[in-house]
Every structure is written in C-alpha cells, then in structure tokens.
C-alpha cells in the first residue's frame, strides 16, 4: 500500500513551491511502477487508486498537457494550465493544474 499524500492523486496542483521540473516528476512517477504497490491512497480521494495510476498520470502530463487549452486563475495563484481527462466518477479521471509560465519555460528548454 502506498499513502501518496498529494503526489499521486486524481487532482494535482503542481509547481507552486519547490518542485522539481515536470519532466523529472513524470520520471519519478514512472519509477513508482517498479514497486510492489497494490493500492494507492491519496490525501484527497475517497477510494484506493489502482497501482498503475502513477504511470497514467505521467502519460497524461507528458502527452496531453501541452494540448490543454483551458487555463485557471485563482487569487494569489499564477495563471495555471489545466488538463482534465475522464469523467469524475470514472477511474481514469485526472485533473491537473500547472503554472503556465513554468510549463512554457520547461517546454522552451526542451526544444
């Protein structure tokens, strides 16, 4: 069993304070797949997440975030790029928000 706190969760608010680059975070999510995890309990989900959810998160962040057109802004937060996939009642639901400036900067350095 993995108690993941805010790191592996269906709702991810990423990159506001002291976080590694998104690419490193995705690599670390993939590394979790090497562990014998049967269930994942996050700080915010009411049910266990499947053991392959970290890989799913990584795949969504690496392949879908760049195409996400939705942005989100809340007082005191920077402009966030938001990705929402799946229906909230389904196991494949994922809602991620990443500071748009940070995302743009990482993509510029990757080119």
Predicted regions: what they are:
Residues 1-31:
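Catalytic core of the metallo-beta-lactamase
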Residues 30-39, 43-111:
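Accessory terminal helices/loops
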């Amino acid at each position: 069993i993995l108690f993941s706190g805010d790191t592996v969760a269906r709702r991810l608010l990423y990159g506001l304070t002291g976080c590694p680059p998104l690419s490193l975070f995705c690599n670390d999510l993939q590394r979790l797949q090497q562990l014998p995890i049967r269930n994942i309990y996050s700080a915010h989900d009411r049910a266990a997440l499947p053991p392959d959810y970290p890989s799913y998160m990584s795949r969504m962040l690496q392949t879908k975030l760049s195409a996400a057109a939705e942005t989100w802004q809340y007082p005191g937060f920077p402009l966030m790029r938001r990705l929402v996939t799946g229906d909230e009642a389904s196991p494949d639901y994922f809602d991620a928000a990443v500071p748009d400036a940070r995302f743009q900067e990482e993509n510029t350095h990757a080119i």
